[in-house]
UniProtKB/Swiss-Prot annotation:
Origin superkingdom: Bacteria
PROSITE patterns: RIBOSOMAL_L2 (PS00467)
Pfam families in the cross-refs: Ribosomal_L2, Ribosomal_L2_C
Organism: Nitrobacter hamburgensis (strain DSM 10229 / NCIMB 13809 / X14)
Function (record text): One of the primary rRNA binding proteins. Required for association of the 30S and 50S subunits to form the 70S ribosome, for tRNA binding and peptide bond formation. It has been suggested to have peptidyltransferase activity; this is somewhat controversial. Makes several contacts with the 16S rRNA in the 70S ribosome.
Protein name in the entry: Large ribosomal subunit protein uL2
Assigned keywords, A-Z: Ribonucleoprotein, Ribosomal protein, RNA-binding, rRNA-binding
Gene Ontology biological process terms in this record: cytoplasmic translation
One of the record's GO molecular function terms: structural constituent of ribosome
GO CC annotations on file: large ribosomal subunit
TM region positions: none
Family: Belongs to the universal ribosomal protein uL2 family.
Lineage: Bacteria, Pseudomonadati, Pseudomonadota, Alphaproteobacteria, Hyphomicrobiales
Length: 277
């Protein structure tokens, strides 16, 4: 889908660049596949702020997207493509031959009327799902499982994909968008193709108010606060903080490595950080 620009009738319109969604379904989502969604405002179950600068925003209904695609060898027809406010990608409503409906992540080049199917050995075409070990090397995939049967976790946002670059015994080698290469078990499943809406990265929000509609509040820097509020705060006039960047709680930030999951390090063949050196 193309990008939309607008006549500069206001400063916000002048800057605004949106994805043209005219080809998407304009009605309401399927009620049986949606749930109510309460705004958390960045608070956890105790009412304390756990994520700063969140709150407000437009009311949203959550669409239950099927990331597992567990219905094997039952063809489904794509009924329509829809907008989903909860993610950057578009979603597709599919209807199985037995009448059941489901939402899936829409890949690029998936059109209304197409047939998709999940199974052990299926055609290599967008939207079909099968184990990574049964796909040819070089296949572009999305919505990839990291644990067998858990449901897709990798390459789910707009325009993303992973590529199968090799095999190693029971595992396949995946190259991710970040540049990381990692081992994923061959029985983990993935959907063929790249995720829809690749133009999302070229959009421009245009004005602060549109960000507020998305539920994001103004972000305040530590150096403009008082010493009671932030380690970088205080000082006469403008200061640079006077120390290496830290969070409001004094922990190093901006490049400090925080990964502690050593048990899965053996599955990472090439780190995403190696590419930047």
């Amino acid at each position: 889908m193309a990008l939309k620009t607008f006549n500069p009738t206001t400063p916000g319109q002048r800057q605004l660049v949106m994805v043209d969604r005219s080809a998407l379904y304009k009605g309401k989502p399927v009620k049986a596949l949606t749930e109510g969604k309460r705004g958390k405002g960045g608070r956890n179950n105790t009412g304390r702020i756990t994520v700063r600068f969140r709150g407000g925003g437009h009311k949203q209904a959550y669409r239950n997207v099927d990331f597992k695609r567990g219905k094997e060898d039952v063809p489904a027809i794509v009924e329509r493509l829809e907008y989903d406010p909860n993610r950057t990608a578009f979603i597709a409503l599919i209807k199985y031959q037995d009448g059941e409906q489901a939402y899936i992540l829409a890949p690029q080049r998936l059109a209304v009327g197409d047939t998709v199917v999940a199974g052990n050995y299926v055609d290599v075409k967008p939207g079909n799902v099968m184990p990574l070990g049964n796909m040819p090397v070089g296949t572009i995939v999305h919505n990839v499982e990291m644990k067998i049967g858990k449901g897709g976790q990798l390459a789910r946002s707009a325009g993303t994909y992973a590529q199968i670059v090799g095999r190693d015994h029971d595992y396949v080698i995946l190259r991710l968008n970040s540049g990381e290469q990692r081992l994923v078990h061959g029985r983990c499943r993935g959907a063929i193709g790249a995720v829809s809406n690749p133009d999302h990265m070229n959009t421009s929000i245009g004005k602060a108010g549109r960000t507020r509609w998305m539920g994001r509040r103004p972000h305040n820097r530590g150096v403009v606060m008082n010493p009671i509020d932030h380690p970088h705060g205080g000082g006469e006039g403008r200061t640079s903080g006077g120390r290496h960047p830290v969070t409001p709680w004094g922990k190093p930030t901006k490049g400090k490595k925080t990964r502690s999951n050593k048990s899965t390090n053996k599955f990472i063949l090439i780190s995403r950080h190696k590419r930047k050196k």
